[in-house]
């Protein structure tokens, strides 16, 4: 019976992979006349656009405000007590359905650095653990199998209020947002009498998008669940890089861009651009195309300060409407101690007491961290709060609270000595809050040669986080290829409709 259902579900979901665009193989791939492209913002979206365009012969200049590339996957060195250490923006997971990003990683020969994580684990406040290894990976059947893990029970399936859970299987790229973008996950959980353990699991999932349950758009959550859990048979098991992002991803991407003639200007903050006579002026140079791939926090003032964009109300209104999400914090600790449970995966979610949402064990995951750990006989822990409460505003208070909650889950670490630390308190992640979707900008804009790219852009496919960032940059490149009568690059996605949705 299960095998029959698996086949039916796979067929309904188009074998879990569909093409986003149609490639005309009769068109040329490389441009033969000089066309200059300015890309502002060197995160994954900007790197994606730069790599795709430079490979085809475009004269690409990528402007990045920081010394390092990568944006939210950035990696850099810092000095502490006479040591030079590597740190990153924070932990990132490469899920198996990140089709476009992973294809690019294969192209630049960094796919080999991916290693699998064993389980998706949540630590509850009472000391119990929730894992997801062993459940059926087939969409729909995986929800039914949650009963094996105590997330659901028999009464959940026969409770009339639980019928509302079916909307999770009805993701629709238009109707879902029309109906549920103004409903919070908190409201949904209360209306459906969601079981406690299921709610804790969903709370952790919602916070992974840097939003509290009462602020998180139910439509965005349904899209996220569809993308990660209900559109493919890879389950929640994912891969991570086996060393820091600079060496395993960012340097190889930079080499790919520059080897194809692209230019990268670091430490170059672009505060404004000028649009005149159908072209863009950036840093006193003139460009045929411009891609804005900054984070939301820096995009909005750039749009407001730029000349020639004030005539375009959609650009002005839509960029003004999008928001940054709540403040978040990342604290990495180099210590003289280890967790006692050596069987844990590299990363765990925690049922926060006040602010701790996850712990990453870098000494188990990355080569450089493992080498430091072996030399210094201590673990490297990253503590992450995806959404800080309003009551925590001071850096020292946040750091102390994160450590206190770490000790709650790992009391054996209470006596640890901290040899080094690196703390980040930021507010630059895009909000997926209530009623944000309608005015969210798309890749194409009112100006035919201006494009947006980033994890904040509205895409025609249910893509999120790193995959959304990469895909948006690749889509911007494809639009430029199309304008120049060049062959597009094939892009792929999970199927854009839920198991019970009608097209």
Regions found by a protein language model. Give the residues of each.
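FAD-binding beta-loop-beta segment adjacent to the flavin cofactor pocket
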Residues: 370-375, 426-452, 456-460
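Mid-domain catalytic core of redox enzymes
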Residues: 4-19, 268-381, 386-391, 409
């Amino acid at each position: 019976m299960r095998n029959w259902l698996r086949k039916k579900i796979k067929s309904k979901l188009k074998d879990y992979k569909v093409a986003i665009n149609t490639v005309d193989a009769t068109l040329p791939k490389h441009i033969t006349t000089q066309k200059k492209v300015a890309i502002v913002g060197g995160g994954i979206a900007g790197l994606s656009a730069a790599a795709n365009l430079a490979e085809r012969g475009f004269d690409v200049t990528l402007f990045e405000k920081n010394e390092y590339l990568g944006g939210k996957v950035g990696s850099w060195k810092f000095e502490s007590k006479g040591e030079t250490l590597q740190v990153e923006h924070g932990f990132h997971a490469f899920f198996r359905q990140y089709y476009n990003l992973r294809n690019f990683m294969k192209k630049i020969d960094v796919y080999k650095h991916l290693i699998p994580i064993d389980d998706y684990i949540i630590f509850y406040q009472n000391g119990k653990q929730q894992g997801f290894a062993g459940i059926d990976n087939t969409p729909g059947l995986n929800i039914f199998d949650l009963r094996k893990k105590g997330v659901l029970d028999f009464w959940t399936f026969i409770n009339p209020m639980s019928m509302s859970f079916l909307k999770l299987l009805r993701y629709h790229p238009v109707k879902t947002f029309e109906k549920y973008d103004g409903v919070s996950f908190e409201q949904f959980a209360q209306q459906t009498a969601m079981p406690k353990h299921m709610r804790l699991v969903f709370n952790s999932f919602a916070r992974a998008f840097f939003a509290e349950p009462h602020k998180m758009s139910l439509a965005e959550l349904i899209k996220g669940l569809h993308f990660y859990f209900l559109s493919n048979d890879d389950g929640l098991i994912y891969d991570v890089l086996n060393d820091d992002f600079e060496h395993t991803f960012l340097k190889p991407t930079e080499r790919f861009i520059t080897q194809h003639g692209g230019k990268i200007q670091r430490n170059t903050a672009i505060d404004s651009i000028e649009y005149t006579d159908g072209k863009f002026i950036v840093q006193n140079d003139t460009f045929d195309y411009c891609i804005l791939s900054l984070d939301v926090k820096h995009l909005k003032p750039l749009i407001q300060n730029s000349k020639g964009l004030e005539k375009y109300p959609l650009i002005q209104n839509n960029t003004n409407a999008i928001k940054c999400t709540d403040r978040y914090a990342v604290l990495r600790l180099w210590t003289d101690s280890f967790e006692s449970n050596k069987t844990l995966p590299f990363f765990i979610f925690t049922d926060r007491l006040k602010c701790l949402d996850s712990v990453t064990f870098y000494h188990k995951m990355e080569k450089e961290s493992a080498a430091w750990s072996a030399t210094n006989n201590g673990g490297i822990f990253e503590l992450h709060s995806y959404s800080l409460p309003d009551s925590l505003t001071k850096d020292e208070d946040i750091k102390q609270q994160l450590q206190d909650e770490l000790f709650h889950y790992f009391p054996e670490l209470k006596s640890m000595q901290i040899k080094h630390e690196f703390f980040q308190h930021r507010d630059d992640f895009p909000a997926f809050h209530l009623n944000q979707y309608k005015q969210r900008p798309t890749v194409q804009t009112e100006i035919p040669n201006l494009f947006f790219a980033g994890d904040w852009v509205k895409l025609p496919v249910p893509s999120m986080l790193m995959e959304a960032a990469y895909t948006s940059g690749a889509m911007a490149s494809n639009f430029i290829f199309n304008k120049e009568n060049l062959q597009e690059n094939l892009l792929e996605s999970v199927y854009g409709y839920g198991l019970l949705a009608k097209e």
